Amino acid sequence: MTSSYGHVLERQPALGGRLDSPGNLDTLQAKKNFSVSHLLDLEEAGDMVAAQADESVGEAGRSLLESPGLTSGSDTPQQDNDQLNSEEKKKRKQRRNRTTFNSSQLQALERVFERTHYPDAFVREDLARRVNLTEARVQVWFQNRRAKFRRNERAMLANKNASLLKSYSGDVTAVEQPIVPRPAPRPTDYLSWGTASPYSAMATYSATCANNSPAQGINMANSIANLRLKAKEYSLQRNQVPTVN
């Protein structure tokens, strides 16, 4: 026992000397430092890789979310529903509630419109109380009725102008049409000349002129001789009348 215990005690200083030696301390310290630094480096590297992976995943997710065509399926229907709801709300706000008038209300409104197209506030309020409507509804009805009245007036004026233009154009065309004269009856001589040749017509005309010229000369000579005889007889009669002393 003592020998074994002494051997153990002897080995302990030897081990202690080995551990306490400078070379062994440096080796152990180097191993320790190496292992810690290595672990730290691995941990830091793992943390950096994980961080980079998280950043890449986050950027990819953000790009996918920000892209208009690659939105998430859970968000797209919700956004579409929100947009539709907002548009429906806007349409509901813009849409006005139409008022339906009964026959008695329309008769009363038309009766007042025949009197005046622009009733004042007192008339509108009184009429609204009578027909069980608000003054704003009565005012809107008169605005719409005036617009309808103006449209009807413009349509009537356009139809009247169109009819006047049509009648005027018809009168102008009737005046501008020339009156065709009736064909005058043609004499037989003209027809005979038209049928005969020009040479024969000229020969006939010259022959008639030649035949008529001696007769005309004789007649003129006879008339001159008659005038001379009458003058002589008149002078003789004056000479034979006795003069009174």
Swiss-Prot record:
Principal localization? nucleus
The GO terms describing molecular function are: DNA binding; DNA-binding transcription activator activity, RNA polymerase II-specific; DNA-binding transcription repressor activity, RNA polymerase II-specific; HMG box domain binding; RNA polymerase II cis-regulatory region sequence-specific DNA binding; RNA polymerase II general transcription initiation factor activity; RNA polymerase II-specific DNA-binding transcription factor binding
According to the UniProt record, list the residues that bear N6-acetyllysine: 160
Q: InterPro entries, from UniProt?
A: HD (IPR001356), Homeobox_CS (IPR017970), Homeodomain-like_sf (IPR009057), OAR_dom (IPR003654), PRRX1/2 (IPR043378)
Q: Does the keyword tRNA-binding apply?
A: no
The annotated consequence of residue 226 to P reads:
No effect on transcriptional activity
Protein name according to UniProt: Paired mesoderm homeobox protein 1
Q: Where is this region: Disordered?
A: 1-24, 54-103
* Cellular localisation: Nucleus
What GO biological process terms are annotated to this protein in UniProt? artery morphogenesis; cartilage development; embryonic cranial skeleton morphogenesis; embryonic limb morphogenesis; embryonic skeletal system morphogenesis; inner ear morphogenesis; mesenchymal cell proliferation; middle ear morphogenesis
In this chain, composition skew of type Polar residues spans 69-84
List the record's Gene Ontology CC terms alphabetically.
Answer: cytosol; nucleoplasm; nucleus
Q: Which of the residues bear the PTM Phosphoserine?
A: 21, 197
Q: Where is this motif: OAR?
A: 222-235
